[in-house]
Every structure is written in C-alpha cells, then in structure tokens.
Amino acid sequence: MDRDNGPRVRVPEQRTPSIPATADALRFTVLGPVRAWRGSELLSSGSPQQRALLTALLLREGRTATAGELIDAFWGEDPPSQALATIRTYASRLRKILGQDTLVSESGGYAIRTERSALDLTLAQDLAAEAEKARAAGDRCQARTLINKVLGLWDGEALASVPGPYADNQRTRLEEWRLQLTETRLDLDLEVGCHAEAVSELTALTAAHPLRERLRELLMVALYRSGRQAEALAVYADTRRLLAEELGVDPRPELAELQQRILRADEELARPADEPAPAPAPLKPAQLPATVPDFTGRSAFVTELGSRLATAEGSVMAVSAVAGIGGVGKTTLAVHVAHQARRHFPDGQLYVDLQGAGARAAEPETVLGSFLRALGTADSAIPDTLDERAALYRSTLDGRRILILLDNAHDAAQIRPLLPGTPGCAALVTSRVRMVDLAGAHLVDLDVMSPEEALQLFTRIVGAERVGAEREAALDVVAACGFLPLAIRIAASRLAARRTWTVSVLAAKLADERRRLDELQAGDLTVKATFELGYGQLEPAQAHAFRLLGLADGPDISLAAAAALLDLDPHVAEDLLEALVDTSLVESAAPGRYRYHDLVRLYARACAERDEQPPVRRELALSRLLDFYLATAAGVYALERPGERVLDHFTPTEYPGLTFPAREAALDWLFTESSGLLACARQSAAIGMPQRAADLLMAVVDLGESGANSHQFATAAKAVSEAAKAAGVPRAEARARTMLSHVHSVSGRFAEAEAEAMRALDLGRLAQDAVSQGQAPNQRGIIALYENRHDDAEAHLTQALTAFRADGNKPGEAAALCNLSRVHLATGRTATAVRLAEEGVAIYDSDASGLALIGSGRTDPARHVLLEALQIFRESRQQLWHGMTLFRLSELHLTEQEGAQAAAHAEQSLVVLRGIGGDWRRANVLTVLGRALTVIGQTDRAQVCWGEALTVFEELGSPEAEAVRQLLDPAGVG
C-alpha cells in the first residue's frame, strides 16, 4: 500500500527530476510535504499554521488572496477573535524566510510572486497537458513517459500534515487528480502492451477504490489480455454485486459491453503483444555484514524490529528507521535483526553504508548502480539518471522478497529513491537523524543501554573473572561511559588488551571528565570522532546553540531556560533545539525539556572552549541563565511569602524570568526545575557569580525542606559558601551559610547548623547584610530551642526579632514571634506563648499557635489550627513542616488520651519525615509514638519505638535520652 493514501503507484520511469535549481532560485513543492528551497537548501517553513498560509498562497498561483479568504482557509466558519492578527504574524514570519519580493502585500491581502516553473504543481499541470497533446497525436509512448513524470512529482500525500479546511479540500482534489492520472497511465500501459505488468497494480487499486468502475474496466482488460479470461469475468461479477449492494445500481454500459466482448473472446480486444525473451534467473545478493559475536541486550528493540520486518510478507512494504546518537549501536542492532530476519527474505539482502554522517554522503544514483549490478543488471543496461535508475530498481525488485539495509543515512531525501516500490520487500534504515519526513516509516529511537546491559557487554569483552572481582569499579566504568555501547566497547577493549591493569585503574582514568573523551579511544575507534561527525553536519546557529547549551550543569533544561541562556526568542530557540533533537545530539526528555548524554555534554563543552571565544561569551550565557532562574524563583518566593523583604535585598537581574498566575503553578515550576536550579547555583558561584548564586539559594529555600532535594540543597549551599569565601564576598558567604545552617537544622545536625549560623551572623555584620542579620540569629534560636537551651534561644530570637523589625520584614518578624512563643511555652509561660503566637502572620503561625494552645489546655482551637497548617504544608510540598505538624497533632491527641489517633498521626509523621528532618526529629516522633501505643495497650511495640529513640539520642548526645531511659524502665511503662 502507498505510505500515505491507497496503493503505491508503480511508475516504471519515475521519478522526474525536481524543479531545476539555480544558486538562489526559490522552489516549492505541494505534491507531498509543503516545502520551500532556495537553490539546494531546504528552508524552514515554520509551524503547521505557517505551512497552511504558504499552501493557500501557492495554490492561487500568483493571485492575491484577501485576508477574508485566508481566514476562511484557516478556520472556516469559526475563526478566532484575533484571526487577522494571527494571519499577519504568520505572513511576517514567512516573509523573513522567503524574502520581501516573493511574499508581497497588496489590496488588503497577500500573494507569492515567483516563476511558474518554481512550483511542482504547475510543472505537473504543464507536463500533463503535453501528455494529452502527445496522446492526441498518436504518440502513446511519449504520452506515457510524460504521465510517468507527472506522477513522479508526487512524494506521498499532497499537502501532507497541512491543517485547515482549505487544505483538506485541496488535498482531496489533488488526490483525485492523481488517481485520474494513474488511470490514464494504466490505460496507456495497456495500449503499449504492458498488460501483464499492470495486473498487480490494478488489483491493489481496485481493492483500495472498489466503487471506481474505470479501474475495474482496466483490470478486466489487463486480465483478458494476459490470458486470464475467467478472472476478468469474475471482476465484472464482483463489480455488479458490489454496485447493487452498495448503491442499488447496475454497472455502466461500457463495463457491460466489455463483459460481452470478453465472453465472445473478442480478438480485437485481446490485441496480443510480442512476448519478451525469457529473462535470466535473478541473482540472490547476500550483502549483510557479519553480526558482532558479543551482541548484548536490546531484546525489546530486536522484537519490535523483527516483527515489523515479518509484516513485509503481507500487503504493506515495511520500512523501519532506527535513529540515535553516534555510538549508540544502531548499525550493530540493525545487522543483528537483519540476520535474524533473513528467512523472511529468500531472494536476498542488500546493504550499503550511506556515509550520512560524513562530509560527503553517498549519492543515491551511485548506490542504485551498485544495487542493480548486485541484482544481475548488466552495466550496459543501467541508465544514467537517478530517476531512470530508481524506476529500473523498483521494477527489478517487483515480485521479489529482498531486505534492504540502508545504514548511516543522511536524511530522508537520500533514502527515498532506494526504497522498494511494492510489498514483499522491506527496508531497514539507520541514521543519526530522526526520519520524521519519511512517510510511512516506523520510527525507532535507540537510547543508551540499561546499566545491566552495559555491564553485560563490558563483561563479555573483558571477562567474567576480572569483572566479578571488581564489580563496583566496573559499574563506575560503564557509568563513566554514559552506558553508550561504543564507549563501553572501547573502554573494555583497552582493558582486555592490558592484563596488568585492574578495572579500578581504568575507572580512575575515566573519572577525570576533562580527559574522559581522550581516554575513550582504541585504535581507529574513538567516541570523540563519532560526535565530531554529527557536529560537523550542523548549521552555524545550531552549532552555536549546541555549544552553549552544553555549558549548563543541570541534568536537563526547559525551553524557557534554554532561550534565556541562548538569548533568543523561545520560538527561535525551540526550532534550534528540535533540530538538535532530530540529529540525536540532544535528547527531548519530555515536551519542552532537553538534555545531553553525559559524553555529548563533555564534547559540547570542549567545542565551546575552542569556539566560543573570548571566554566572556560563555560566562555571559551562564549569567543569563542565572538571571532567568533567579528572577523566576524570586517570583515563586513572593507568591509563597507575600510581604517578605528578603527579595528587596537580592542583586538586580538583567534578564527577566517567568511569571505565574497562581501559587500552584509556581510550585510546580520550582520542584520541576529543582536539580537545574541547584546546579546553576553551584556552577555560578564557581565561575565568579557568588552573590546571585547565594540569592538563588535563598529564593529556592523550599527545596531544602522538600526531602527529595535537601541533600542537593546542602551540597549547593556548601559549594556557594566556599566559592564566596574564596572570592572575598562576605554578604554572599553569609547568606549561603545561613541556608546551610537551615538545611543542617532541618536534618537534625544541630552542631553543624549552629557553627554555620554563628559564622553567617559574623559575616552578615561585617557586610551589613540585613538578610543574614535577621535569619542567622533566628536559626540559632531554633537550634537552641531544640537543644533545650531556652535562655540562649530567647536571646537569639529576640535579636532576630529586632533585626527583622529594623528591616521592616513582617513575615520574618512573625516567624521570630512564633519561635519565641515556643520558648515561652517550653519554660511554662503559656499565656505569653499564646499571645506571641497569635501575633504571627506568616505561614508558620498555624503550627506555633497550635503548639501554644496545646500547652495552655485549649485543645479544640489547637486542633483546628494544626489541621489548617497541615493542609497548607501538604499543598505547598513542605515535607518537613508537614511531618512536624503531624507530630504536633499526635501530641495533641495524646494529651486527650486518644491513643489510636495519636499513634496514627505519629506513624504518618515518620513516613513523611523519612529521609529528611534528621535522626533527632525521628527519635522525638518515636518517643511520642511509644507513648501513644501504651495508651492502646501495645506495650511491646512501645518498647521497640523507645529503644530506637534511645539509640539515636545517645548517639547525638541529646538530653532527651534520660527521659526515654525512664520510659523503658518497666515501672515506667503504661
């Protein structure tokens, strides 16, 4: 079947050369995907909507299309309110591509001014008119040749993937014309005696268009002239039955008359043609390269591709295109699958390396010449032109079952002439480029190996004994190779050839990122050379984007962040990124997100160091990314903490960030971008931007409390503080150390938290930084409160309160008041505790008020306040405070002797705090859980909880240990 619509039309003399191109001439095609060329360069026609506009103008053949006509073409009877503005936008973008003289504005509309021969449709119309003249003059062979050229201009379905009602109508019209031309060509085939060859094509066409009587008439003639009178009559009977059942009509008179002539064995109708001489038995090529003996893994891909090749036995010609980064094992996989599928292709297998990743890809006509010779065609019988060779190639393959492996393809244009024209054969294509424009192809994206597959491949080359002795080092090696098969094979081959090396020696060599690509070479195998082939194919703008994007340390990057780094409009950035994805140099992790393979990132950075000079160009790119992240994160912070003065003290940014309509969307962005944000903070500080890096940490402080990100946050805060210290920027160091103190405190590492807070306060005073002078003593007060140093806690928190008030920081003031409330509660001053807590206005006031109300015996309002806090923390993904509020609720239920509820909340708290909050908090929750369990009579479980809590408190040297020892005393149980 045709890859787009209906059966593939067999045209023995396809396909006609494309429209003649001069160096700068514009050319357009609509008989397939809508495209534009300038000379031999394919131009980007933009979005589907832009292609729809281009289509509407091209099909008017130079006539002006009014705005109203274009709006109708795009949207029909239901245009949007901004339809005219949208049309103008698309027209402006197209004009930039095509030029001011080509896309012109006049009389309130638009037109494309170009030569008639520049459009494939008008060329097809002119050729069809010449064919009619030739036929009328009795030159059937010339008419047939011209019609073949017309049909050869089609490249799949006309106006492929162009949206809009106008395009739909025109697509239907053009497909009808194509079918009429096919009928004309088949009629000419019969007139020149090619009836036997026409039968299979007519059979497929009538199956696809069962009610088209002209096709059935031609099929009856072809069968009759091929000596198949009974089958010809059966076609008529089937036609009569079908028309009666479907439409309630009889066949047209011409068809009935044809049946009578066949019944009479009309000799004039038979018109026997000269029988050609018997052809020699065709050769059976077997060109597949040998499969690698250590082929490993890829079972899902082997099954998927194998099943696709097996379908070639049916009515559809199977084409599968495997794409992936250089070195990922595309050829190895394809050759392995092809060998397994040989039994499905008894007439042979063809293979060619198309050298698509090199500077000079193989020319299709050269490949066709080689294929034709392999299929038994004499040199003297091989035509000169691409179209003639392709036509002969398809004719030679017709009726045979041959597998064609097209390895290392450059693009779909190189592939199309090499594809079979009829079912039975199959093609397997490999390329670094995703063949999205190869209509009908089954696309397979080949990724790197899984860690298990990678280790298996490494083991098969190196040997099980050596790998088994150093399994962890072997895992380090394959991870350093990024699980890329070529890199693993090179590393393993080097190790296998050096018996004195251990696996650990190789792992150590690969640990140095700056040397890693140089280490990954063995003989003529090298990872760097593989990447260089792909890089060399990029356009200058694509190569520039490839280099700069590789500079960012994050595991992936969003489109918006990439646009900031590249200093481009997001639409332009997206086009570049998607082009890089199509070349497999960049991966699309998810819609709108992009990432590099680890080794490709190293290569991109090496290219950037070489080509992005002076170094300030690289620094400016990372500075834009930092500005984007900081500006956006500051907006999230403002939504989370309205009125917070911290943002007023941030370093101004030059590049804007995103804005969010609601808090939920802002938090989604924050947690989605978490790894990139923290990586940017580390990287920016290391290259001389510690102040903005420290500000970024403060803006994303929620990540330090989220559990999944707390370790990354601590690592980033430490890196920023050290970089700020080395650079002599005390304000940045103070803020980074404040954040480091915070995350240490959240994790229960109070000694480290106290040390960082003390240093932060000293630095804040030195730098006269209002932010750290408020937050550092507040942090010290919290630590002292946890350690039951109530006098110190009150002093530090009072100092923080003074600093926050001096700065006009109301949320900070509220936090300090809430924390002071807890100090007063712990020292028995419950009335003051309630008063202080009720003054709190920040998000933490619910938890603090609840704690104070519990201490004063007012449990009902405490329950309400804590449940409100629980909802807030759960929705904002603040896992630490979510877990601690569950802990407070457990304490509340315990005061009411509600043991079951207390135990349930304590157990939930342990689940939420798993991995965050530190051992100290976990031990406190275990202590309360033990108390709750005794209330409901589960004393054995209570003993276990207290035993775990005691171990933690003793390891931390916490004073709570003594209270737990008393609980563990049998006299204290119950």
Curated annotation (Swiss-Prot):
InterPro entries: AfsR-DnrI-RedD_regulator, BTAD, NB-ARC, OmpR/PhoB-type_DNA-bd, P-loop_NTPase, Sig_transdc_resp-reg_C-effctor, TPR-like_helical_dom_sf, TPR_rpt. PROSITE patterns: OMPR_PHOB (PS51755). It comes from Streptomyces griseus. The gene is afsR. CDD domains: BTAD. GO terms for molecular function: ADP binding; ATP binding; DNA binding; pigment binding. Belongs to the AfsR/DnrI/RedD regulatory family. Phosphorylated on serines and threonines by AfsK. Residues 274-591 form the NB-ARC domain. Keywords: Activator, Antibiotic biosynthesis, ATP-binding, DNA-binding, Nucleotide-binding, Phosphoprotein, Pigment, Repeat, TPR repeat, Transcription, Transcription regulation, Two-component regulatory system. It comes from the Bacteria. One of its GO terms (biological process) is antibiotic biosynthetic process. TPR repeats lie at residues 814-847, 923-956. Gene3D superfamilies: P-loop containing nucleotide triphosphate hydrolases (3.40.50.300), Tetratricopeptide repeat domain (1.25.40.10), Winged helix-like DNA-binding domain superfamily/Winged helix DNA-binding domain (1.10.10.10). Component of the AfsK/AfsR system involved in the response of aerial mycelium formation to glucose. Residues 17-114 bind DNA. This is Regulatory protein AfsR.
